[in-house]
Amino acid sequence: MAEFPTTARVVIIGGGAVGASCLYHLAKAGWADCVLLERNELTAGSTWHAAGNVPTFSTSWSVMNMQRYSTELYRGLGAAVDYPMNYHVTGSIRLAHSKERMQEFQRAKGMGKSQGMDLDILAVDEIKNRYPFIETHDLHGALYDPNDGDIDPAQLTQALAKGARDLGAKILRFTPATGVSRAGDDWIVQTEKGDIRCEFVVNAAGYYAQRVGEWFKPYGGRTVPMMVMSHQYMLTDEIPELEAWSAENGHKLPLLRDVDSSYYLRQEKHGLNLGPYERNCKAHWVNPSDPLPEDFSFQLYPDDLERLEWYVEDAMARVPLLGTAGVNKVINGPIPYAPDGMPLIGPMPGVPNAFEACVFTFGIAQGGGAGKVLAEWITEGQTEWDMWSCDPRRYTDYTNQAYCVAKGMEVYGHEYGMHFPWHEWPAGRDQKLSP
């Protein structure tokens, strides 16, 4: 058994895709004396049950950069670290029901072009050429992203972990962190197996980030602005027509996003994966009667398909093939949300030599880029890209728990909402006011 490390340059708390990516990128930057702590097995939080979609599209410059980098990293990661990877680059089609949505797509295409990506606008008659099972009579067009796809979240995390270990970094599984303290300019990270003295500490604890954040309050920290949503997706039985089409064409269907109806539909082997972002959504662990469990590793919420009924019916009308298959499995798991739906990655406000890489709503898509950004913050003191929209310091003390819950539910229900200039979303109003 390996000796327990008592010192390190960096300790990362949390072993999901983001935490593993942070460790990998630090090690690649030459900082191999780093330790990742995971209370259970790697991926035990939100990573293991994630759908694994990997888009590049975003209307945020920071997020688009992270997601673009992730797709580039993932293409070569398996070979780079000698680990098997199921990464399918299928392309994706985002549907537009209005001219306003097409204008948003044109803007995203321009952003992508400036980052070296070749997003394409599709006319209505071009959509069926790429997705023959779709109804298009009420559409205005679509945005096609050739680099979109999906990846196995567990394989991704294990590949990043292997790459980090091969470079000399350490991963301690089944080693819960229990607190932190200061010793001069260093941090002492306490675990059930002993203490680790380090220069820097990273909160990458996913939906436990708020609980971990409490440990830093004596040293200038604040309550991490976040809440937790229930997100469901359903997997169908195999569909013979889909199997035949894939065999004939030699690849999977593009991932379909009906953003005005608020769901994604993806080919999963020879069936389909439907994941809505419903308006009548549900938050968890937001009040004393529904507390955050001490350990929710590898657990799910009970199925709750009734609140998805409208979205399932809408998807069946859009892709009638969906209605021919039975439901094989339902996944209903916790996903963390910040009040604006953006992750927290950067310096921990008010706390020296402490960083956050947490509250990733799309941690699989953004995980690769997040590791790069976090490693740059620690090793260089700055990032290549403008990351202010994801910086933890963008929030101040107006983000109480009621505000976080209201905004998180609003963001979830409008996951694909169009963000017009000067539009004021109603949830949480009057919480932040001028003097």
Describe the predicted segments one by one.
Residues 4-18, 35:
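Beta1/beta-strand and adjacent pyrophosphate-binding region of the FAD-binding site
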Residues 27-47:
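Glycine-rich FAD pyrophosphate-binding loop
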Residues 144-200, 211:
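Helical element adjacent to the flavin cofactor pocket in flavoenzyme catalytic cores
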Residues 260, 269, 283-286, 291-411, ...:
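C-terminal catalytic lobe of FAD-dependent flavoproteins
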Residues 18, 42, 208:
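Conserved Rossmann-like nucleotide-cofactor binding loop
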Residues 195-252:
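Central helical "cap/lid" subdomain
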Residues 65-68, 95-103, 144-162, 172, ...:
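Short beta-strand to alpha-helix junction loop
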Residues 52-130, 260-265, 269-273, 420-422:
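Dinucleotide-binding Rossmann-like beta1-alpha1 core, especially the glycine-rich loop
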